[in-house]
A protein has these predicted regions:
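Conserved beta-strand scaffold positions in the cores of enzyme catalytic domains, especially
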Residues: 44, 121-123, 141-143
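Von Willebrand factor
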Residues: 1-59, 62-106, 109-111, 124-132, ...
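Short, structured coil segments at secondary-structure junctions
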Residues: 117-119, 137
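Short, charged, surface-exposed secondary-structure boundary motifs
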Residues: 131-139
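Extracytoplasmic/secreted cell-surface and envelope-processing proteins
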Residues: 15-16, 110-115
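A short acidic, amphipathic alpha-helical/loop segment
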Residues: 21, 114-117
Length: 148
């Protein structure tokens, strides 16, 4: 079973519409993989300056339900480090055994961890921003673009 963590920046600068867009974009990417939800365990984590909420999704139905029911928790400042600490603890408890990647949707204005973990990380932005320069060089920076 492969595992993926999707973290969503729920600080005051990210709207519910933006959070739902992040989830929609992720679903589009993941659903293109053959039998994705039959082989994956996906953590969806909301974080502003601390972990506000998380859910583990194992199926397409659970994903759709989560997208419909999601409420934004947080709205404070942004600190990316609690998600990395959450992952470390889940790995220590053996709840995460085969983590492939962390995808972190954000506007980029926050505190980044200093050390690279043992899994791939991508910080995903809706548009290019000055904050992208703060992303550590060991992480990917992706821009999904704005819809018109």
């Amino acid at each position: 079973l492969e595992e993926l963590v999707i973290a969503i920046d729920t600080s005051g600068s990210c709207s519910k519409e933006l959070v739902q867009r992040f989830l929609g974009e992720t679903y589009q990417i993941l659903s293109t993989r053959e039998n994705f939800f039959k082989k994956m365990k996906v953590y969806i984590v909301q974080c502003d300056c601390c972990i506000q909420w998380y859910r583990i999704v194992h199926s397409e139905e659970e994903w759709r339900s989560c997208m419909q029911e999601i409420t934004i928790q947080g709205r404070g400042g942004t600190d990316f480090r609690p998600v990395f600490e959450f992952i470390r603890k889940e790995k220590a408890k053996r709840k995460l055994r085969n983590l492939k990647a962390l995808i972190y949707f954000t506007d980029g204005d926050g505190i980044y961890p200093r050390e690279k973990p043992d899994y791939e990380i991508a910080f995903v932005f809706v548009k290019k921003t000055e904050n992208m320069r703060f992303v550590p060089n060991w992480a990917y920076k992706l821009v999904i673009g704005e819809r018109t």
